[in-house]
Every structure is written in structure tokens, then in C-alpha cells.
UniProtKB/Swiss-Prot annotation:
Origin: domain of life: Bacteria
Name of the protein described by the UniProt record: Endonuclease MutS2
Biological process according to GO: mismatch repair; negative regulation of DNA recombination; rescue of stalled ribosome
Alphabetically ordered keywords of this record: ATP-binding, DNA-binding, Endonuclease, Hydrolase, Nuclease, Nucleotide-binding, RNA-binding, rRNA-binding
Example of a GO MF term: rRNA binding
Subunit structure as annotated in this protein's UniProt entry: Homodimer. Binds to stalled ribosomes, contacting rRNA.
EC number(s) per entry: 3.1.-.-, 3.6.4.-
Record's function text: Endonuclease that is involved in the suppression of homologous recombination and thus may have a key role in the control of bacterial genetic diversity.
Source species of the chain: Streptococcus thermophilus (strain ATCC BAA-491 / LMD-9)
InterPro entries xref list: DNA_mismatch_repair_MutS_C, DNA_mismatch_repair_MutS_core, DNA_mismatch_repair_MutS_sf, MSSS, MutS, MutS2, P-loop_NTPase, Smr_dom
Record-stated family: Belongs to the DNA mismatch repair MutS family. MutS2 subfamily.
Binding site for ATP: G328, P329, N330, T331, G332, G333, K334, T335
Keyword Nucleus: no
Length: 783
């Protein structure tokens, strides 16, 4: 798009309004480089980014990047094998820290569905090792002692020397205080000295480094500290050398990652820019417009972004409307209306929110042209007309059906009759070329053109004859009328004279009366529309209030539900503990076989609702603070991942435990099981509910479940359920299981086959007989 239109409509001033909402230099640079786009997909993507940022603010009450410098120049220097200075390293350190913070924010993000922003969040790369290395430089620009052992040693020696010097000088102060001009230790040329009275300069042996302007004080470095000061000077040089080496090493660590760090910096800046767009939208009560696909546009209550308290107006360009002609006298706001339309389009095509109401729709134009300028004096009329015509010629030679043309005072600056004819001919050319055009004129002849010509519509700016002031309201469909007679009458001109003037222009008076009636009807319609909008706003406020109350109720409901779930889980755990005790006693008395004990326990567990308390903060804290007792061989345990009971059989050298769980021997870490007697057993995570059906009844009691139905499951969910199902089957001594996966696309079926092929407790597997499901069901033999 041509850049001339940006200057004509003062688009850079609009962009400046976004500056106060941006925190990073990268976002400021992106704003400076922002120009209108012509690709609808790119524009829509930026609108989606703003919408998703709005949802983040609503759900999480904020989002911030922090103040970040532009690091493009330091990164360029790294690529040239240059070493960075401390301030440049601090700038990169802050970018890496902000990147890590943003990644954590995204990981903790809940209740927000992201599409456009998700792509940005997931492209951020973390550099924990680089962050750790850069911690050796604090934000004040100081290299910490721990940056290297050598630096730490140098600074330790410096402190020792400095302490020794101070102690020596303090001793001199005590003994020779009467010889000193001031009872303090001064510094000259980086060396510690004493301010000695000139009369005693020969009483203290040492080197004179300075004399006061009055000559009464001599700054002497006592001989006793000269050697120490020399050592400090050398240590300072060593310190500078070591710090330079550290900066070189840090630069070398960053060098291989310049591209990724640059990408992170761009994402942070772009995120900040999106945040700024949202804050502008929120503060200015702006909106994200819809995008039409047929060059129609509808702007509801659109406002000029650069005016203070602008009047809001509605404007539409339907598919069958090509030209809008705004007629009527000057100073009514016609030019402002032209600029308002142009700026709304430029802002929207730049991915910015516009000052309008919801339901507004913009078109996507490949070019926007304008001829807008203030009228010049009569003496300059020729140059004014020539200037306008030069612009018009350029526009007509370049514009096409994908363009928007804005012309102010078309045909002005020449003979009125010729100017009106020329204006009409130009508008007709634009109409026939199907170029969307809005033009202003004060020529009354164009009113008839707007009424009589297809795809052309008149418009005007409302004028309040009671106050004799323009209202700046845009009245589409109503041509402008002359208010000269009414103004003259209200200003006190003799009524006889006014009547005589009206009689001399009977035809024009009839037209004006018709226009006046149209204006009255339009004003009445606008009042009704405003009333409807007010009602809609009240309904919107009511809906928001109801939604807020609902959210508060839902929050309290969730808290009470979690509390109830905890109480229920405690009751269930107590019952399960009692059942464990009963079954153990029966087993000890050899009244049940081992596999019958496991089977009975499984049936008892089915009575317990599996309550998900994994998000219960109180329980998580209690779990962390529980008094742990060291496990021993022979202890009964609960395997956390499966909720199954087992027994510890031995402990390996690496600290892991061997456990017997049903038919399976497992190697477990200490945090992968809990002791049966520990209170924390009540806190085990909720097991994944497995979709199974019972085996055919072979005895009077229910048998263990041996069929898993994975139809309709997602891949990850299906694999989790399959893994848990096979473990449960092995623990219940099942020899054969059925897995129903259906045929479908074959993804789940292939995944089941791969899983069974790798499992060491699956002897063999095959598809079920055709009568029992065929290739939609797999039968696996366990052992």
C-alpha cells in the first residue's frame, strides 16, 4: 500500500497512541515498522491474537513481559565474534529470564483456549544453563564473587589487604591524631592516604600524593602501607583481567544460541505488542472488527481516534453501493468523516483495534487513495484547483476495483458550474470502475446525481437550526441542504426579505423541504436505534453481572465439592483399611487362596468412588509434610501409579526397592510407593477409570473383568487405559484378555499391536474370530 495515505491521514499519530502501552524496545520497534496489510489471513491472525490476549486478561487478571532492551545489536556483535560488555549481557540475561517466566506462565495457564498465541508460547526456547551462568552478573552491573574461583580468590586477597591497610592507618590515627587535619582515611589516585597538617608533614614518613588548595593539608601515604597499596594495585589489575576473561567466556557460551535468543526476543516483543493492543482496546472501548470477503463495510458508532470526545457515527458500504457523496455546507464535519473512514480501514488492515462498536465490519483494500486538503484563499484558487486535479489524475490512473478512494471537496477551486460538472464526471468514472468512493462537495447539483444514479447514495452532516451549530452527526441517505434562510431568520433578518428570497428560489425551497423531512425521519430513526443500543448495553451489563455471580457460585461450589470429596475419600479409605485387615486375617488362616484375596480386594475397591484429590492443595501440603519412616524388607506397600498392594522383597545398591506385586516383580523408587500403614495412603492419585465389561459368569460370584473397550478414545487416553488394564489383569491372575479397538483409521489398532508385542508378560496375541469382532478386537494371552 502507498505510504502517502499514511501521511495524509496522520496514521503515525494514531500509532503513537499505542506507545504508552508497550514495555519492551522490541515492541516499540514493531510499532514503528507497522504498515497496513492486504492479506486477510495475516490480519485475522493478529485479531485472533488480541482476542486470545483478552481472554488471558479476563481469566488471569493480567499479563506482563517487563521492560526489555532491544538486543539485536549485542546479538549481531556476538555473531562477529566480539565480546559483550556487562550491560549487554544484563540485557540478554533479562530476555532469557523473561522467556523462562513466559514459559512458566503458559504451563500454568488454565481455562483459556489458545490457537494463535499457543504457536508463539510453544516456540519459546528455555536456556536454564545460560541463565545460571549469567546469574554471576547482577542487575547493578557487578560481577559476583562466585563467577569464578580465581575472581573469588583475588577479591579475598583485596579484602585482606584493604583490611590490613585500614588497621595500620587506624593505628596511626590513634597515635598521631593531633597531626592530622581530619580524623579520617582519605583516598588519592586509588591509594589510601592520611590528611596531615602541613606543619607535621615531615613527622609522618611516606609519599605525598596531593596538597589541598589552601596548602594547609598534605595527603600522605604512610610508608607502612605502601607495599600493601602496591599489592592492591596489582590485584585490581588482576581483577580487571579476570572479569574480562569471564565476559569473554559468557559471550562464548551465548554465541551458539544467537538465533534462538533472537527468536525469543522477537516473541517477547510481539507478545508485548499484542498486550499493548489489548490495553488500548480496553481503555479506548475499541473493538476487533469482522472482516468482509466482498468489500462491504459497516462501521457502527465509529469515532475518529485523534479527536477528543469525537461524535460517534454509523457508516455502511453495502455490496451494491459504490459511491457516497456527502453534500452540504462546510464546517459540518465532512472532512472528519472522510478521515474517520480512512483511519478505521488503515487501523484494521494494520491489525489494530478500531474505535467502533461490536458488529462493525471492514473490507480489505489493496490500496487507499485520498485527496484531502484545506481550502486556500481566492488568490490561490488556481493553484488549489491544479493541485487537486494533479492528485485526482494520479488516483484515476492507479486505482482499481480493489481500492478505496477518499476525495474532499471534489471539483473545488474553479467555476462552480464547471466544477460541478467535472466532479460528476469523475464520480461517474469511479462508479463505472466499481471503485468504492466517498467524496465531499458543496455543489448542490450533485444531490440530484446521488438520487438519480444507481449504486450512488447521498449523505450529509446534520445541522441544528435551533442552536445554529453543526452536530457532526453523519446522515447517510439524506442529501445536505442549505440552511441560509433559516439562519438569516434566526439572526434577525427582516421576515419580508427572507420570504422574498424564498420566493425567488421556489424549486430549491421544495427540495429543501423534502430534505428537511428526510432529516427529521433520519433523526427519529437514529433516536430509536440509540434507544435500542442503550437497552442492549443494559442487557449486556446484566448478563455480565449474572456471569460474575455464576462464576463466584461455581468457585464456592467447587470448594465445597472438594471438601466433600475429601471427607468421602477419608471414609472410603477407612473402609478399605478395614477390608484389608479382614482379608489379611482370612489369608493368615488359609481360608482364602492368594489370588482370591486379590480378587476380593478388587471387588471391594469397586465400591469406592475414585475421587480426584490430586489438585487439593491441603492434601498436597500434608503429603509433603508427612512424617516419613524408612521402609524395610517385608513391609506392605501401595504402588502409587496403580493403587495396588505389594511387598518389599529387597533393596538394591542404588537405593531402589524390589517389590512383588501379584505376579509382577517391580523395581521402585522410594517416592513411587507408600507404606500401607502410613496415613498418606489416603492421598494416592486417582486411577484412570478403565472401560471394561465382566467376563461371562462361570461361578456364582462375579469374576474379574477381562475386556477393555477403546473405541472412540484418543491415542494418549487409549494407551494409558491399555497399560493400566494389562497391569490390573496380571495382578488378578488373568490368563487371557480381550481388547476392543475397532477398525476405523487403524491408529488405535496399530498402537495396541505395538504395545502387546513389546510387553514381556504377553505370551501371544491375535485378532478375535470373525463372529467375535474380527480385526476390530485383539485377544491377548498373558503369563
Amino acid at each position: 500500500m502507498n505510504t502517502k495515505i499514511l501521511d495524509q491521514l496522520e496514521f503515525n499519530k494514531v500509532k503513537d497512541q499505542f506507545t504508552e502501552y508497550l514495555q519492551t524496545e522490541q515492541a516499540q520497534a514493531e510499532l514503528r515498522d507497522l504498515v497496513p496489510m492486504t492479506n486477510p489471513e495475516r490480519i485475522q491472525n493478529q485479531f485472533t491474537e488480541i482476542q486470545e490476549m483478552s481472554e488471558i486478561f479476563i481469566e488471569h487478571h493480567g499479563f506482563a513481559i517487563g521492560s526489555l532492551r532491544d538486543i539485536s545489536e549485542p546479538l549481531r556483535r556476538l555473531e562477529l565474534d566480539a565480546d559483550l560488555n556487562i550491560q549487554e549481557l544484563i540485557a540478554i540475561k533479562k530476555v532469557l529470564q523473561a522467556s523462562a517466566d513466559l514459559s512458566r506462565f503458559y504451563a500454568d495457564l488454565e481455562n483459556v483456549e489458545l490457537i494463535a498465541l499457543k504457536r508463539l508460547f510453544e516456540k519459546i526456547e528455555a536456556f536454564p544453563s545460560l541463565q545460571g551462568s549469567l546469574q554471576s552478573i547482577n542487575d547493578g552491573g557487578f560481577i559476583e564473587h562466585f563467577a569464578s574461583p580465581e575472581l573469588q580468590n583475588i577479591r579475598r586477597q583485596l579484602k585482606a589487604c584493604d583490611d590490613a591497610i585500614r588497621q595500620t592507618l587506624q593505628d596511626i590515627l590513634k597515635k598521631s591524631g593531633h597531626m592530622l587535619a581530619e580524623n579520617l582515611i582519605a583516598s588519592r589516585n586509588g591509594r589510601s592516604v592520611l590528611p596531615v597538617k602541613n606543619t607535621y608533614r615531615n613527622r609522618i614518613a611516606g609519599v605525598v600524593h596531593d596538597i589541598s588548595s589552601s596548602g594547609n593539608t598534605v595527603y600522605i601515604e604512610p610508608r607502612a602501607v605502601i607495599q600493601l597499596n602496591e599489592k592492591i594495585t596489582q590485584l585490581r589489575a588482576d581483577e580487571r583481567h579476570e572479569m574480562a576473561r569471564i565476559l569473554h567466556e559468557l559471550s562464548d557460551q551465548l554465541r551458539p544460541h544467537t538465533a534462538a535468543i533472537a527468536n525469543n526476543a522477537w516473541i517477547l516483543g510481539h507478545m508485548d505488542f499484542i498486550r499493548g493492543k489489548y490495553l488500548y482496546l480496553h481503555d479506548k472501548k475499541a473493538i476487533i472488527p469482522e472482516i468482509s470477503d466482498n468489500q462491504t463495510l459497516q462501521l457502527l458508532n465509529v469515532r475518529h481516534p485523534l479527536l477528543i470526545n469525537p461524535v460517534a457515527n454509523d457508516l455502511r458500504f453495502d455490496e451494491d453501493l459504490t459511491v457516497i457523496v456527502i453534500t452540504g455546507p462546510n464546517t459540518g464535519g465532512k472532512t472528519v468523516m472522510l478521515k474517520t473512514l480512512g483511519l478505521a480501514q488503515l487501523m484494521a488492515q494494520s491489525g489494530l483495534p478500531i474505535l467502533a462498536d461490536k458488529g462493525s465490519r471492514v473490507a480489505i483494500f489493496q490500496e487507499i487513495f485520498a485527496d484531502i486538503g484545506d481550502e486556500q484563499s481566492i488568490e490561490q484558487s488556481l493553484s488549489t484547483f491544479s493541485s487537486h486535479m494533479t492528485h485526482i489524475v494520479e488516483i484515476l490512473n492507479t486505482a482499481d476495483s480493489n481500492s478505496l478512494v477518499l476525495v474532499d471537496e471534489l471539483g473545488a477551486g474553479t467555476d462552480p458550474q464547471e466544477g460541478a460538472s467535472l466532479a460528476m464526471a469523475i464520480l461517474e468514472h469511479l462508479r463505472l470502475s466499481q471503485i468504492k468512493t466517498m467524496a465531499t462537495t458543496h455543489y448542490p447539483e450533485l444531490k440530484a446525481y446521488g438520487i438519480e444514479t444507481q449504486h450512488v447514495e447521498n449523505a450529509s452532516m446534520e445541522f441544528d437550526t435551533a442552536t445554529l451549530r453543526p452536530t457532526y452527526r453523519f446522515m447517510q441517505g439524506v442529501p445536505g441542504r442549505s440552511n441560509a434562510f433559516e439562519i438569516a431568520r434566526r439572526l434577525g433578518l427582516n421576515e419580508i426579505i427572507v420570504k422574498e428570497a424564498e420566493n425567488l428560489t421556489d424549486t430549491d425551497s421544495d427540495v429543501n423541504r423534502i430534505i428537511e423531512q428526510l432529516e427529521a425521519q433520519t433523526v427519529e430513526t437514529q433516536k430509536r436505534l440509540e434507544h435500542i443500543k442503550d437497552v442492549e448495553q443494559e442487557n449486556l451489563k446484566f448478563n455480565r453481572a449474572v456471569k460474575k455471580l455464576y462464576n463466584e457460585f461455581s468457585h464456592e461450589y467447587d470448594k465445597e465439592l472438594e471438601k466433600a470429596q475429601k471427607e468421602i475419600q477419608e471414609m472410603v479409605d477407612t473402609a478399605l483399611a478395614e477390608s484389608d485387615s479382614i482379608l489379611k486375617n482370612l489369608h493368615d488362616k488359609s481360608q482364602l487362596k492368594p489370588h482370591e484375596v486379590i480378587d476380593a480386594k478388587g471387588k471391594l475397591k469397586k465400591l469406592a468412588a475414585q475421587v480426584d484429590l490430586s489438585k487439593n492443595k491441603v492434601l498436597r501440603k500434608a503429603k509433603k509434610e508427612k512424617a516419613a519412616r524408612a521402609p524395610r524388607v517385608g513391609d506392605d506397600i501401595i504402588v502409587t501409579a496403580y493403587g495396588q498392594r505389594g511387598t518389599l522383597t529387597s533393596q538394591a545398591k542404588n537405593g531402589n526397592w524390589e517389590a512383588q506385586v501379584g505376579l509382577i516383580k517391580m523395581s521402585l523408587k522410594a517416592d513411587e510407593f507408600t507404606l500401607v500403614r502410613a496415613q498418606a495412603e489416603a492421598q494416592q492419585p486417582k486411577k484412570k477409570q478403565i472401560n471394561v465389561v465382566k467376563k461371562a459368569k462361570k461361578t456364582s460370584s462375579d469374576g474379574p473383568r477381562a475386556r477393555l473397550d477403546l473405541r472412540g478414545k484418543r491415542y494418549e487416553e487409549a494407551m494409558q487405559e491399555l497399560d493400566a488394564f494389562i497391569d490390573q489383569a496380571l495382578l488378578n491372575n488373568m490368563s487371557q484378555v480381550e481388547i476392543i479397538h475397532g477398525i476405523g483409521t487403524g491408529v488405535i489398532r496399530d498402537a495396541v499391536t505395538k504395545y502387546l508385542r513389546r510387553h514381556r508378560h504377553v505370551k501371544n496375541f491375535e485378532y478375535a474370530p470373525q463372529s467375535a469382532g474380527g480385526s476390530g478386537c485383539t485377544i491377548a494371552t498373558l503369563g
